[in-house]
Amino acid sequence: MDRFNCILNDTEYIYYLKRNKKFEKDRKFCKHNLKHFLDVARIAQLINLEESLGFNKEIIYTTAILHDIGKSLQYENGTPHEISSWEISKEILHNYRYNEEEIEIIKQGILGHRDKKSENFAQLMYRADKLSRLCISCKSIDECNWGDEKKNFKIYY
């Protein structure tokens, strides 16, 4: 988990984390912050262990902290955040010596985390991302654009 922890302290990573916070300052719906990222990581790792999927813990955690890192660019210029998150992540991953195989897995997780039909690692990230949202206690649930079929009214992890 050394590389993962280095990313958490990376100047560029912190810059985009702060940008997300700035753009979501007045947002009343789910935020795209470190708490969300770590919720996704922990849920994905629990699913990984429960279902014996065999994914590497550091790859799961790394993907989770990067999957929404470009959300501010979606607010700013309309770029889908999975695309901007991947663009930001590429250089960061190379800086901390992730190998090409690891980078490809992380890429699939970031780019596929919004696609219900995604497979393998991307499907794990999709599931964890959705399960991380606490709709059951949300004060803005009635205004949320998620349909009831998507909202979490139960806690699984």
Swiss-Prot record:
Cross-referenced InterPro entries: HD/PDEase_dom, HD_domain, HDIG_dom
One Pfam family named in its UniProt record: HD
Signal sequence segment: none
Disulfide bridge map: none
Residue ranges constituting the HD domain according to the UniProt record: 33-134
SMART domains: HDc
Gene3D superfamilies on file: Hypothetical protein af1432
Record's protein name: Uncharacterized protein Cbei_0205
Organism: Clostridium beijerinckii (strain ATCC 51743 / NCIMB 8052) (Clostridium acetobutylicum)
